[in-house]
Amino acid sequence: IITSPNHYAIYASALLVGGHVFNKPDWIKMSTKVLHRFCVQEQAADGYWGEHSQAGPTTGYDYLTLTQIAVYWEYSKDPEAHKALRRSTDFHKYFTYPDGTPVETINDRNRHWGVSMWGHFGFSHFPDGRRYAAFLTSHFPYDGDLNSYGGNMQSFGRIAQNVLYYHEGKTAPIPQDMVNYAHAMKIPAGIRKTGSWVVTYSGIIAPPVSQNNFFLDR
């Protein structure tokens, strides 16, 4: 299938849920194989799922892929999914600006993205993830979501999904709560916060994808 990882993960998670709803073991088996692979092979060491390669992230769309792994865990309780969610939480909590928007400097598809409501329940397995979910929600544009993927209707649907699957528990501080923090990725990129200033640096070299209208040079 020639498509992006977030699409492929959405197809697989829809097949998984459909398999449980309609009692189709073959659907469950096929989707489980795909989503388990997303957990153990397709995720980069820094916690993201690259859209074109593992050489760098696609910050906004990564929320979509994360959501499908979170759904997969809810139905399978695969421990590898839990590990993948931990890595994803670490990635997103570091690479989110103080206003809740994902860092665009390292993004190879979108220069700007709104505050995402996708997959907060995936973060909610962990104390810092629950705090991160609350942080994102606090920046949701209550007068109308015109910037994130899908706009109002998509975000409202994702909020409902978060309510359905959310894991309550204690919270722990995240980088946005700190006066200063710095984080370096395994690839040549990182972020630093000093007071009210946040600076992201990137030396990512990702080869251009031929005839791909969605690719942005980093």
Per-segment meaning from a language model:
Residues 1-83, 108-117:
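Aromatic-lined, polymer-binding surfaces characteristic
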Residues 78-218:
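Extended polysaccharide-engagement surfaces of secreted carbohydrate-active enzymes
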